From Swiss-Prot:
The name this protein goes by in its record: Quinate/shikimate dehydrogenase
Organism annotation: Escherichia coli (strain 55989 / EAEC)
Keywords, ordered alphabetically: Amino-acid biosynthesis, Aromatic amino acid biosynthesis, NAD, NADP, Oxidoreductase
Quaternary structure and interacting proteins, as annotated: Homodimer.
InterPro entries referenced in this protein's UniProt entry, alphabetically: Aminoacid_DH-like_N_sf, NAD(P)-bd_dom_sf, Quinate/Shikimate_DH, SDH_C, Shikimate_DH-bd_N, Shikimate_DH_fam
Sequence similarity: Belongs to the shikimate dehydrogenase family.
PANTHER family reported in the protein's UniProt record: BIFUNCTIONAL 3-DEHYDROQUINATE DEHYDRATASE_SHIKIMATE DEHYDROGENASE, CHLOROPLASTIC, SHIKIMATE DEHYDROGENASE
EC numbers for this chain: 1.1.1.282
Gene3D superfamilies in alphabetical order: Leucine Dehydrogenase, chain A, domain 1, NAD(P)-binding Rossmann-like Domain
Cited function: The actual biological function of YdiB remains unclear, nor is it known whether 3-dehydroshikimate or quinate represents the natural substrate. Catalyzes the reversible NAD-dependent reduction of both 3-dehydroshikimate (DHSA) and 3-dehydroquinate to yield shikimate (SA) and quinate, respectively. It can use both NAD or NADP for catalysis, however it has higher catalytic efficiency with NAD.
Amino acid sequence: MDVTAKYELIGLMAYPIRHSLSPEMQNKALEKAGLPFTYMAFEVDNDSFPGAIEGLKALKMRGTGISMPNKQLACEYVDELTPAAKLVGAINTIVNDDGYLRGYNTDGTGHIRAIKESGFDIKGKTMVLLGAGGASTAIGAQGAIEGLKEIKLFNRRDEFFDKALAFAQRVNENTDCVVTVTDLADQQAFAEALASADILTNGTKVGMKPLENESLVNDISLLHPGLLVTECVYNPHMTKLLQQAQQAGCKTIDGYGMLLWQGAEQFTLWTGKDFPLEYVKQVMGFGA
């Protein structure tokens, strides 16, 4: 790819950043489509995020992806949020139109799309959702919008717990889905929730390097063959949770599905063009 002065810059702002496959995926897609953009990763944490957004404007970047730990903070730095992003309270995509910043969240649509592409119908189903960060709440919000009957959200009593309660209130007030929030330390409640669940989704970083030997499911007997287990983590590809799920006879969806479909939507938001899906799946080695 020969980058010229006509090329526009798209970024990814996250910390840590070196594990991300998004730059490789998006640049392969941009090159295949013959579009004058290049995608670069920038190591940005909460402290440096405000300055990074000023830099985005000053450099007239087309936009940026947003990942941990900036997804919720980023909402404060855009001029407009989509209705779904407001419900989530977090964004993973910024589009810059001549200095006017719009915030989107493609994590939820991407993950739910991956579930649907597997042939699973979420309407009327119950999901156990692990975590209350940006990706997790995006999945919950989109699932509620698209027909989940109930979401049982489990999170530790950390800085995200109050945010989880606020998220549940927003979803309960604006959709027909019922959301409850429980401390993950309550293992009896967790076991009871899994027993009646149709879907278990890990929206946390547990399982991602360097936590690849960890899982929030401490007892594999809690997983039953009728359960669909889905991951947001894609590095490593086969997390400990997915290994447990396969041993228990569950159907699984790895983190590549969400990465692919959320990235496809981002690509279109930034470029106005269709994402070369089949090509990217092939060159990236995704089985999604």
